From Swiss-Prot:
'Sentan' means 'tip' in Japanese. Residues 18-29 have a biased composition (Low complexity). This is Sentan. The gene is SNTN. It comes from Gallus gallus (Chicken). Gene3D superfamilies: EF-hand.
Length: 144
């Protein structure tokens, strides 16, 4: 046999318009399913009776760790993407602020350069401090 499709007996023949499938994208195929952050957080015994602040910090650390490479670092490009997807409500409306533009430009420079957790948290807190959402949070009443 020549190896062409018509002469190979074990070759499956597909229609021109195959039915859509619900399979995972090829990049995710074979990858273990990620455990939700809430379940990861719940599995940390020391935080069973943790304060809201402790749990908030642990959540930020878990989000970072789930995206970091085996050495515990993120590229600047990955950092920018993570902040834009996981911190979008804090970033919203900041696009024209000079400090925000400066921070994003710094992430765009040498996008493959790696940053550690400390630098990530500094970026996270800096973006939160710039945010219009922070003022809204400050205005929330904590008592009746």
């Amino acid at each position: 046999m020549c190896g062409c499709r018509a002469s190979v007996p074990s070759t499956k023949h597909y229609s021109v318009n195959p039915a859509p499938t619900t399979r995972s994208p090829p990049a995710a195929a074979g990858m273990p399913k990620r455990i939700p952050i809430a379940k990861q957080l719940a599995s940390i015994k020391a935080l069973e009776k943790g304060s809201d602040l402790e749990k908030a910090f642990a959540t930020a650390a878990l989000v970072y760790n789930n995206s970091a490479d085996p050495e515990g670092k993120l590229s600047k490009a990955e950092t920018k993407s993570l902040l834009q997807t996981q911190f979008s409500r804090f970033i919203q409306g900041q696009e024209n602020k000079p400090k925000y533009q400066e921070m994003i430009s710094a992430l765009d420079e040498e996008p493959e350069k790696k940053i550690d957790f400390e630098d990530f948290m500094i970026s996270l807190v800096s973006l939160a401090l710039l945010s219009d959402l922070l003022q809204e949070i400050k205005n929330v009443k904590s008592t009746k």
